[in-house]
Amino acid sequence: MNTAIVALPPTLDPMFWIGPEGFFAAAMLPATLVIIFVETGLLFPLLPGESLLFTGGLLATKGTIDIWVLSPSVAVVAVLGDQIGYLIGRRIGPALFKKENSRFFKQHYVTESHAFFEKHGRWTIILARFLPFMRTFTPVIAGLSYMSYPLYLGFDIVGGILWGGGVTVAGYFLGNVPFVRQNLEKIILGILFVSLLPALIAAWHGYRSQSRTAKSELALPD
């Protein structure tokens, strides 16, 4: 019995765009580093951190990115981004507790990160690396709490190496597993879809909220 394997159309195949010969192949490394910096340093928590690094590791098995360039580069950029977050915490940290919710910022991001920091102390700097949202706001909380900067920097470097290096290398080694290697395109599509869900859901909720507000204002009598 013959089993037909349906290939993805070229434009739906992620390798068409981000493979070694893909249209955006040369942009993968700088784009990854920019996204990681924005997530960690500019307080934008909805970017797909882990999934992006894991995908980068998978792509390294195809030759799109050199894993031994990607891993240390991500670790360095993540640590640099965190220094911005720490500085923000030192300078304007208290104001974040008064900031109103918006499409991409929720007050509970800050309060939950603060509670986590209070519970785990200095180890939060490492643990929060692996927790979405918290890795964005933990540097701010550390700065707000006036944690000793040399101590913070030491823990942050360890966390950056474990997260930036660990997740990418894990993706690289998993990408060499025969089953994963044979289905790499579909796996990357799945990762991209899942990683974009939080941003899509947040955008949808923001749109619904604005629509309800607009309808309420129209319903008010003159």
From Swiss-Prot:
Coiled coil: none annotated. The chain crosses the membrane at residues 23-43, 67-87, 157-177, 187-207. Keywords: Cell membrane, Membrane, Transmembrane, Transmembrane helix. It is found in: Cell membrane. Its main location: membrane. GO terms for cellular component: plasma membrane. Pfam families: VTT_dom. It is a multi-pass membrane protein. PANTHER family: INNER MEMBRANE PROTEIN DEDA-RELATED, TRANSMEMBRANE PROTEIN. Belongs to the DedA family. This is Uncharacterized membrane protein ML0287. The lineage of its organism: Bacteria, Bacillati, Actinomycetota, Actinomycetes, Mycobacteriales.
